[in-house]
Curated annotation (Swiss-Prot):
Protein name: UPF0102 protein Tcr_1695
InterPro entries: Restrct_endonuc-II-like, tRNA_endonuc-like_dom_sf, UPF0102_YraN-like
Protein family per UniProt: Belongs to the UPF0102 family.
Pfam family, one: UPF0102
Organism whose genome encodes this protein: Hydrogenovibrio crunogenus (strain DSM 25203 / XCL-2) (Thiomicrospira crunogena)
GO molecular function, one term: nucleic acid binding
Length: 120
C-alpha cells in the first residue's frame, strides 16, 4: 500500500470511529494487530454486542466496490484476529459478537454500515 493510500485509510478509520460514537458505539480498540492481520475498530454497542469493524474506502469502483474488497481470505484473517483479541481480553468473551463492514466510496463523509457482514 502506498503512502497516500495508507494516509487516506487512517483518515477514514478515524472518521468511522467518530461517526460510530454518534451511533452509540463505544470504541474499545483501534488497529488491533495480531499475527497475520489487523482489526480496524472494535466497538461495544448499547446491548453489549462486541462488534469487529473492517473499514474500507474506494475512490472508484474500477476494481470493485469497497464492500466487495472483504474477500473470504480477509474474513478468515479478521476471525483469527478476533479470536486473538478475545484471548487477550477475556472480559469480552461472554458478549454476543458480530463482524460489520463500514465502507466509504468517493467523497462520502459518512460510511455505509453493513451489519453482520459475515459469520465466523
Amino acid at each position: 500500500m502506498g503512502w497516500l493510500s495508507q494516509k487516506i485509510g487512517q483518515q477514514k478509520e478515524q472518521q468511522a470511529a467518530v461517526w460510530l460514537k454518534t451511533q452509540a458505539i463505544t470504541i474499545v480498540a483501534q488497529n488491533f494487530r495480531c499475527k497475520g492481520g489487523e482489526i480496524d475498530l472494535i466497538g461495544l454497542d448499547t446491548d453489549d454486542t462486541l462488534i469487529f469493524f473492517e473499514v474500507k474506502y474506494r475512490q472508484s469502483s474500477t476494481f470493485g466496490t469497497a464492500s466487495e474488497s472483504v474477500t473470504p481470505q480477509k474474513q478468515q484473517r479478521l476471525i483469527q484476529c478476533a479470536q486473538n483479541f478475545l484471548q487477550k481480553h477475556p472480559n469480552y468473551q461472554a458478549c454476543n459478537m458480530r463482524f460489520d463492514v463500514l465502507f466509504f466510496e468517493d467523497n462520502q463523509t459518512q460510511p455505509e454500515w453493513l451489519q453482520d457482514a459475515f459469520w465466523s
